[in-house]
């Protein structure tokens, strides 16, 4: 063997390749798993009636009354429909039926990629606007000036910033389910963490990991535990004490883990899981940052950064109070960007160049979102999601209490891969899974907790969720992330399992 030849090394596939492989697998599953469907109930506010959609038959309408819900074995308050708390179709228990097979073919691979991108256009526009905003601010030198001021003030107490960001993300997750919105924080916080001597994974840990742990142990999050409790026919305050306890334990684990990791890479930078890519990260996020030079932190730059920071609480307020979604969030960021353009002191040419360059850097992230949506479309159009739900509900039905609830936890781990939307999985699964708790004699709120903890254990890794979008944005290989996050998944499942078994045991006493 020629010693001069370089030894070949395995390069882990990119996010695009991983999702493309999963898309092909999803198409293949439509040939293996039988197609099936539950009848779905929706509320028509215009006519004040319930509409039941079943495969192969005409839609049926029923009076929007409590009696109708009782007759359909749906234990949800009528007000949750009439007041708009539940807007998505609800699966009706006991209505699953096999239907003709909906095979997907080769042409559906590319078709779903296009359709998924079209469905995700609102998110993509938000990301493009965010990227353009970052590009303009970068051109003004405001980020680098602010970074230098921050590094000087936090010298010796760098982890305090990691701690503060993590706590805020945990609180955002448990109260309002901050997930996609957190994408906006990466462009500003990655340079901060790199300047403090950390790596990009610390930034993902402080934002995505902390927010996801907070969402996993949701207390009042309307997009997961509240809608799941409503779909299960109970108050969301039932079981909130154990979820709050889990939140404290989970947040402690995340912060302690980040402290350990930060301390290790401070002492030995080569310990970083992304050490091989450190120069690429610094070139991308800190290409004009030199700690040995001085950039004046002028009043104009302070004003620009202030406007940038203000945009985030405005976004959070809009989501929580104003019912905003991505079009409104994009519009608010664009409005602030235009203000920054006028006070930036840049020429019209520089403004347009910096905006388009900033947006273009996030094209890959946007395409990942569209591809992930394409995978979900294949599963929906192949009509195999309901079949998997029906099969899993039959598996855990009739088990003893503790075994049943741990089985539910495992079921929701797998369902989290198929249906990465927390609200979507809640309205699909809770009307089916929650009544099973009655048959084994345990409260339904324990099933809601199992749903939340199981689903989010999967969403730390699920390629169809937000994780690949995050990793693509920061150019972090998926295998490095898996190595970093696995201990936290173990903590989540351990805490969740213990709390579930304790709740069942206390109820059985």
Swiss-Prot record:
Write down a Pfam family by its short name: DcuC
What main location does UniProt list? membrane
Q: Which residues cross the membrane?
A: 14-34, 117-137, 158-178, 188-208, 209-229, 240-260, 303-323, 324-344, 359-379, 399-419, 423-443, 458-478, 484-504
- Membrane topology classification: Multi-pass membrane protein
Compartments in which it is found: Cell membrane
What are the record keywords, sorted?
Answer: Cell membrane, Membrane, Transmembrane, Transmembrane helix
- State the GO CC annotations: plasma membrane
Q: Which InterPro entries match?
A: C4_dicarb_anaerob_car-like, DASS-Related_Transporters
Q: Which domain of life is it from?
A: Bacteria
Which PANTHER family does the entry mention? Answer: ARGININE REPRESSOR (PTHR43652:SF6), BASIC AMINO ACID ANTIPORTER YFCC-RELATED (PTHR43652)
What family is this?
Answer: To E.coli YfcC.
The name this protein carries in UniProt is Uncharacterized protein HI_0594
Organism from which the protein derives: Haemophilus influenzae (strain ATCC 51907 / DSM 11121 / KW20 / Rd)
Lineage at the top is: Bacteria, Pseudomonadati, Pseudomonadota, Gammaproteobacteria, Pasteurellales
């Amino acid at each position: 063997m020629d010693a001069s030849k370089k030894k070949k090394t395995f390069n882990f596939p990119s996010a695009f390749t991983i999702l493309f492989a999963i898309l092909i697998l999803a198409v293949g599953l439509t040939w293996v798993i039988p197609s099936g469907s539950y009848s779905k109930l929706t509320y028509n506010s215009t006519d004040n009636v319930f509409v039941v959609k079943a495969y192969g038959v005409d839609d049926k309408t029923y009076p929007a009354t409590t009696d109708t819900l009782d007759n359909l074995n749906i234990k949800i308050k009528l007000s949750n429909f009439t007041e708009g708390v539940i807007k998505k179709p609800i699966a009706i228990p006991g209505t699953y039926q096999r239907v003709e097979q909906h095979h997907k073919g080769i042409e559906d691979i590319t078709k779903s990629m296009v359709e998924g991108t079209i469905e995700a256009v609102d998110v993509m526009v938000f990301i493009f606007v965010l990227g353009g905003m970052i590009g303009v601010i970068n051109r003004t030198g405001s980020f680098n000036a602010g970074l230098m001021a921050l590094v000087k003030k936090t010298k010796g107490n760098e982890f305090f910033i990691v701690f503060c960001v993590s706590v805020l993300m945990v609180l955002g997750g448990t109260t309002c389910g901050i997930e996609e919105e957190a994408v906006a924080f990466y462009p500003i916080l990655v340079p901060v963490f790199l300047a403090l001597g950390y790596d990009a994974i610390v930034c993902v840990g402080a934002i995505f990991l902390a927010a996801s742990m907070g969402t996993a142990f949701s207390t009042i999050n309307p997009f997961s535990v509240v809608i799941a409790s409503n779909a299960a026919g109970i108050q969301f305050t039932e079981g909130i004490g154990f979820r709050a306890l889990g939140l404290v334990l989970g947040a402690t684990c995340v912060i302690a883990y980040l402290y350990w990791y930060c301390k290790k890479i401070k002492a030995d930078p080569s310990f970083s899981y992304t050490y091989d890519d450190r120069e690429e990260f610094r070139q991308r996020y800190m290409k004009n940052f030199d700690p040995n030079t001085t950039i004046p932190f002028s009043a104009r730059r302070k004003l620009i950064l202030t406007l940038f920071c203000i945009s985030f609480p405005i976004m959070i307020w809009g989501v929580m109070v104003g019912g905003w979604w991505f079009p409104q969030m994009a519009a608010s960021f664009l409005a602030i960007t235009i203000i920054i353009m006028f006070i930036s002191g840049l020429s019209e040419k520089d403004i347009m160049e910096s905006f388009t360059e900033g947006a273009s850097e996030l094209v890959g992230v946007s395409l990942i979102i569209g591809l992930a949506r394409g995978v979900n479309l294949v599963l929906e159009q192949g009509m195999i999601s309901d079949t998997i739900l029906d099969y899993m509900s039959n598996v855990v039905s009739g088990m003893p209490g503790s075994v049943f609830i741990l089985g539910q936890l495992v079921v929701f781990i797998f369902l989290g891969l198929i249906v990465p939307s927390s609200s979507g999985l809640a309205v699909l699964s809770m009307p089916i899974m929650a009544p099973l708790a009655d048959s084994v004699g345990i409260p339904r709120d324990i099933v809601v907790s199992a749903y939340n903890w199981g689903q989010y254990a999967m969403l730390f890794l699920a390629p169809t969720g937000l994780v690949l979008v995050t990793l693509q944005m920061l150019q972090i290989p998926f295998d490095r992330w898996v190595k970093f996050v696995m201990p936290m998944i173990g903590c989540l499942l351990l805490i969740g399992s213990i709390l579930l078994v304790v709740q069942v045991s206390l109820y059985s006493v």
